[in-house]
From Swiss-Prot:
Classification via InterPro entries: FAS1_dom_sf, FAS1_domain, Plant_FLA
Function summary: May be a cell surface adhesion protein.
Biological source species: Arabidopsis thaliana
GO cellular component: a single term: plasma membrane
PROSITE patterns in the record: FAS1 (PS50213)
Protein name: Fasciclin-like arabinogalactan protein 10
Pro residues biased stretches: 340-374
Amino acid sequence: MATSRAFTLFAFTLSLLTVASTVSGHNITQILSDTPEYSSFNNYLSQTKLADEINSRTTITVLVLNNGAMSSLAGKHPLSVVKNALSLLVLLDYYDPLKLHQLSKGTTLTTTLYQTTGHALGNLGFVNVTDLKGGKVGFGSAAPGSKLDSSYTKSVKQIPYNISVLEINAPIIAPGILTAPAPSSAGVSNITGLLEKAGCKTFANLLVSSGVIKTFESTVEKGLTVFAPSDEAFKARGVPDLTNLTQAEVVSLLEYHALAEYKPKGSLKTNKDAISTLATNGAGKYDLTTSTSGDEVILHTGVGPSRLADTVVDETPVVIFTVDNVLLPAELFGKSSSPAPAPEPVSAPTPTPAKSPSPVEAPSPTAASPPAPPVDESSPEGAPSDSPTSSENSNAKNAAFHVNAPALFTALVTIAATSLLL
């Protein structure tokens, strides 16, 4: 009997471990890699870095296009426009085939990734999902007067309450999304103008006076990421006097604030390795590492951290961020010294209590609850981004299940063990 209970408990625990690992994360590139008919869609997710953004989020639905539908979209438009169109196919809520046919009132508006980019005007970043007659489900722009030009065709993959991948027969086209002007070389390469407008005039002036702006501009076509300190960041305590640096050191410092690749926020959130900068060379690493705190991205130099504050521009293949601290490379300013460990407290000898003649019996005090242990308020590294805005009629239970999966798993194991061993 005991052996049977132990085996049952083992099987139950194993099944829960499977569930726990299932809800822990997803990789859209791997999900689509086994299906050749989505190879073009998958390739564009990687080129535009939307794959990283999708992987950094939870409770999400991706509406995929087969190669035929994708060619009609990608063949006629630049990469920046394709990215906007594809971001409209990423719904910030979980929709599986069952939920599509159980919409309250048969229709709903749901938020998409496009709405979070800042490019969507009004409600152009929302999608209309409608359960049609005959078991069909239509998708269209939420803009007034828009038609349901796209239809659900089949399910591709579901990781319950985490990610759902559904195929649709045509892209969802919001008014103006395909006619949006591609970033011109003059517009994007006017980096100093963008920086000055964003409150980074000191940084912009240094780029011009040092000649590093030419390095930035020559990198634009292949990809460029800039971390621009604000004017206030240069006035902060601890920022070294740049006049004490050699010209070569100033150049290295400024180049340390840029990457020779397009790396938007979603890519930085999922990054695990050291990142090479424009200053990286054989003589020194000059690299950066990243961590996350909720939806925030923090850059680490070895000297001190700096938080991504705002996005100045994100137009494939160029992204410019403002940061709240000047990035100080350890190669120039040395690594931050770790605080010395606190000395161990010296134990005082325990005094021997004096013997009392006869103890007086005191009334039993009311038992008090022990104080709760201190709670670490800092988010763990790699913590998931903040939950996206739920669409109308979204399933709150689904979101709760995903977020609380570890706690639920622990509780279920405890209950199962107790019931089986009694």
